[in-house]
Structures are given as C-alpha cells and as structure tokens.
C-alpha cells in the first residue's frame, strides 16, 4: 500500500541544483571534493560539531568518540542502561491500567520518554530519572531540535534562533551545567589517582573533557551534546509511528506475517524500511571545494552549494524496484 508523501522543497534550497537520483546523491556524499553545506544558520547549536566538520578534523573527532560505539560499550549501554530504562518506562505504563486491566499509552510520548532517558545517559546528562524531570528534559531537547533545524522552519529564522538560545540557557542551568561540573570533578579525581578510568562515566561529555583540545572553544561540548541529544532521539521518534502504521497495513494485506510481530529480525528489517521512507532530514547540502564534473556530466563550480534530496533518492526505482514508494519489510 502506497502511503508516502513527496517532499516539497523548502525556500532555503530553492534556486540551487537538486539531485534526486540515488547514484548521484551517493556520489556527491562520498566525494572528497565537497564539504558540509547544511546547518549554515544553526551554527549556534551545531557549529563545529561532528555533523558540520569535514576531512581530517572530522576523522579526529570520530576517533575521539569511537569508544562510545565499540562493541563492549554498546553491550554495556544495552544491558546496563537501555533495557532497564525501557523496562522502567513500561512499568510506569502498567500503573495506568484502565478499569478493564488494559494498558493504553500514547506511543509517540512513550518513545520520546524512553529516548530522552537513553540519550541523557549516553551524552552525560544527570537527573533524568523521574517522569517530571524527564518531561522537562524532553521539552528542552525538542526546543533545541527546533533551533538545530531552523533552516527548515516556516517562522522568522532570526526570531527562532533568539528564542531557542534563551531556552538553552535554562537547559544549561538545570541539566547541562551540573552534569559537566560533576564530570570535571571526577576527571580531577582520576588525574589525582583517586579513581580508575573504568570508574569514570561512559558518555560523551566525560570523553570530551577527559581529552580536552586547546583548539576548542568553551561551548563546543555543549554544541556536540546538543547534536547527540537531538540526533539520538529524532530519527527513532520520527520513524516509530510510521513503522506502526506500515506494519498495521502490512498485516492486513499479509495476515500470514502477523505471527512475526515479535520476530526481532523481521522488526529490524521493517524498521530499516520505515527509516528509508521517512528520514527526519529530507536533504543534505554540500559545497564544492573545487570545480567538479559528476558522472552524468553535470558541472558544479567551486563554492557552489547543491542539495542532495534523500526523499526521492530513497524511492529511486532503479535501486529499490518498481514498488520503491511502498513499504516492504522484505526489500
């Protein structure tokens, strides 16, 4: 069943070259002759973070943060943090059974609650441990996400940036600042020989202050943390409701697959398919570092900005088949 909407290009990418074929988008994104061209207006929130840097600087930052994504770290997060946090969120739902004993919950709100707590742990934000604190934290992250994606906003961009920067001050005072202060104290204990490195928190903020680079400005860890907090929740929060709708429709058309609703491999494939069709960022912009001629003979001048549109590229029939616009968990 085709339930997919097409992308209407927003004003900030009108007037520049658009690339919608999967092969050309892939070529541009892989090319060393382009640099990041997105988030030009959202620099106060993402500037110099992993998402907006290129080449050697990007490689060094990725190497610094690599310990967060090693197998042992991911296993630690899954078993020590992720599963307990999910269980806690589900237990809180059980407390709200109706008179028939049925638990009902708003899936979007539930997923946001789970992801808020998980992103706090991996980034290094303390105190996201009650429903009240989680709601406050989640509101901050959603507001920061508005600032981080200001290019796509239909509001006055200057007003959005000003408003979200004021909101960020509250986030720093309530959550970020105390979390940094505690980690800096623990790092000093480690450097004085009173703690082992294994006793330090396993999160982004700790890594950045433990391996501080004198070329960084004081707010860089805040912007990097903003990237982690926004990105770690946005993709999943955006995809899950779509996934549920697609699965509901799929099971109606393919009742023989209903028994797979708890099959992890099937659900993983379905999740990948939902993300393919519903990426939270519909496009990335790149800037040419030199004159470039693409494989289709299109010429791009040095300094020219181009738009790689993921929505049509991920529905390219030459790559994904004639039913590319439809959900298929077996693709």
Segments from the language model and where they lie:
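Conserved cytochrome P450 K-helix/beta-meander segment immediately N-terminal to the heme-binding cysteine loop
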Residues: 33, 309-331
């Amino acid at each position: 069943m085709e339930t997919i909407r097409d992308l209407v290009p927003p004003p900030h990418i009108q007037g520049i070259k658009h690339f919608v074929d999967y092969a050309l988008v892939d070529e541009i994104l892989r090319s060393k002759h382009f640099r990041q061209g997105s988030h030009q207006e959202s620099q106060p929130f993402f500037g110099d973070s992993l998402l907006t840097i290129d080449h050697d600087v990007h490689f060094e930052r990725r190497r610094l943060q690599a310990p967060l994504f090693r197998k042992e770290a991911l296993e630690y997060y899954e078993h020590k943090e992720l599963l307990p946090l999910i269980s806690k969120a589900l237990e809180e739902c059980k407390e709200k059974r109706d008179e028939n004993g049925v638990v009902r919950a708003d899936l979007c709100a539930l997923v946001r609650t789970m992801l808020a707590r998980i992103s706090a742990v991996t980034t290094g934000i303390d105190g996201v441990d009650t429903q009240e604190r989680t709601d406050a934290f989640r509101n901050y992250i959603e507001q920061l996400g508005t600032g981080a994606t200001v290019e796509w906003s239909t509001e006055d961009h200057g007003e959005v940036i000003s408003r979200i920067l004021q909101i960020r001050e509250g986030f720093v005072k309530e959550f970020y600042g105390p979390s940094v202060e505690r980690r800096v104290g623990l790092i000093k204990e480690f450097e004085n020989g009173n703690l082992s490195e294994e006793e330090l928190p396993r999160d982004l903020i700790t890594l950045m202050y433990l391996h501080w680079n004198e070329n960084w400005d004081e707010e860089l860890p805040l912007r990097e943390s903003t990237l982690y907090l926004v990105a770690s929740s946005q993709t999943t929060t955006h995809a899950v409701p779509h996934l549920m709708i697609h699965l509901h429709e799929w099971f109606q058309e393919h009742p023989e697959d209903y028994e797979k609703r708890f099959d992890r491999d099937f659900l993983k494939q379905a999740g990948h398919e939902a993300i393919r069709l519903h990426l939270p960022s519909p496009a990335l912009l790149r800037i040419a570092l030199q004159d470039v001629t693409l494989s289709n003979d299109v010429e791009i001048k040095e300094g020219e900005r181009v738009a790689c549109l993921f929505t049509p590229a991920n529905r390219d029939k030459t790559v994904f088949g004639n039913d590319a616009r439809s959900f298929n968990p077996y693709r």
